[in-house]
């Protein structure tokens, strides 16, 4: 129960959601339960957290909220129907929440990483696949975890005075490439 858990927390100045589920499917064969599970995890959990924390007055005035999402929030991807639908729904959550939360000077944004140079990437992609992705980026390299962390750090800092309702792509120019998929 979120209410019981959150009631013991102090008032929060920064909240970051960096979680999610993924699955592979198409519109022609998606499973309703899988889509529902992804929507619950990737979208409704965040909305419920914001709602419950707000109702308990656990979000301080001027707080910074941030969602770590994915480039698939704004792009389509073959065989990732449920995942991209759930990530796309985050776009609406971020924009709509920014309007409501702005009344209390609370900022909410998202970062949308692409393929990152990380142990997880090396575990799930072959070196050939990684090289192919690198070739499809404007910078001919993958962003580092530090690239993501630096953007997150700024967005949740007091240096960020007026950026809200925005989603920042960190993909080394992958989306901008015409040959990326």
Regions found by a protein language model. Name each.
Residues 3, 7, 17-36, 55, ...:
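Conserved mid-core segment of classical short-chain dehydrogenase/reductases
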Residues 21, 28-50, 66, 90:
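Catalytic Tyr-X3-Lys loop
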Residues 55, 99-100, 161:
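Alpha-helical segment proximal to the catalytic Tyr-Lys
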Residues 64-89, 94-103, 115-116:
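Catalytic loop of short-chain dehydrogenase/reductase
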Residues 102, 107, 163-165:
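Short, small/polar-rich loop/turn modules that mediate ligand/substrate recognition or access, typified
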Residues 112-123:
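Short, flexible catalytic-loop segment of classical short-chain dehydrogenase/reductase
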Residues 137-148:
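A conserved structural motif in NAD(P)-dependent oxidoreductases
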Residues 153, 164-181:
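Short C-terminal tail/terminal secondary-structure segment
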């Amino acid at each position: 129960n979120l209410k019981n858990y959150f009631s013991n927390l102090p008032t929060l100045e920064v909240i970051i959601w960096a979680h999610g589920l993924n699955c592979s499917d198409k519109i022609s064969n998606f499973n309703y339960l899988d889509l529902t599970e992804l929507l619950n995890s990737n979208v409704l959990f965040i909305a419920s957290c914001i709602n419950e924390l707000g109702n308990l007055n656990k979000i301080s005035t001027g707080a910074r909220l941030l969602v770590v999402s994915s480039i698939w929030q704004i792009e389509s991807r073959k065989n990732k129907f449920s995942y991209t639908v759930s990530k796309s729904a985050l776009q609406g959550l971020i924009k709509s929440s920014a309007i409501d939360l702005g009344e209390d000077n609370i900022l909410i944004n998202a970062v949308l990483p692409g393929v990152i140079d990380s142990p997880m990437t090396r575990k799930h992609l072959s070196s050939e696949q990684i090289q192919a992705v690198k070739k499809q980026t404007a910078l001919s390299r993958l962003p580092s975890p530090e690239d993501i962390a630096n953007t997150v750090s700024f967005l949740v800092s007091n240096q960020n005075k007026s950026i809200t309702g925005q989603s920042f792509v960190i993909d080394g120019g992958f989306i901008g490439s015409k040959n990326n998929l």
